[in-house]
């Protein structure tokens, strides 16, 4: 899970609600940061209380900050079987990540698309 926008916060909250309702014995909520952000460094204890695991991408943290998020996003796609997103237009970093996921043969559910959400945008 990233932490770059409203959708990331909403998705994290949904995962925690489901874990609370059905139990957390078979799930975790992992935050993957592109580099140690100031927000994380200044609030490390609250982050550790909220997330099951916190990782910092080595490859992303070694890159220029503008490239770091895309590197981190691709790493998350590579580790995933299912990608859930909310992408309304075919431009920007989120779109590039979804495009990459589709190229990798991942199942993509786009919550912004009400009619056809699996592997379609």
Predicted feature residues:
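Acidic/glycine-enriched connector segments
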Residues: 1-121
């Amino acid at each position: 899970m990233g932490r770059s926008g409203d959708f990331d916060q909403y998705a994290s909250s949904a995962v925690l609600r489901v874990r609370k309702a059905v139990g957390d014995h078979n799930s975790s909520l992992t935050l993957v940061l592109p580099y140690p952000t100031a927000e994380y460094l200044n609030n490390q204890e609250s982050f550790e209380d909220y997330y099951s695991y916190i990782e910092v991408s080595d490859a992303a943290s070694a890159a220029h900050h503008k490239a770091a998020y895309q590197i981190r996003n691709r790493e998350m796609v590579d580790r995933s079987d299912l990608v859930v997103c909310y992408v309304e237009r075919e431009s920007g970093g989120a779109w590039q990540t979804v495009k990459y996921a589709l190229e990798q043969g991942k199942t993509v559910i786009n919550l912004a698309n009400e009619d056809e959400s699996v592997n379609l945008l």
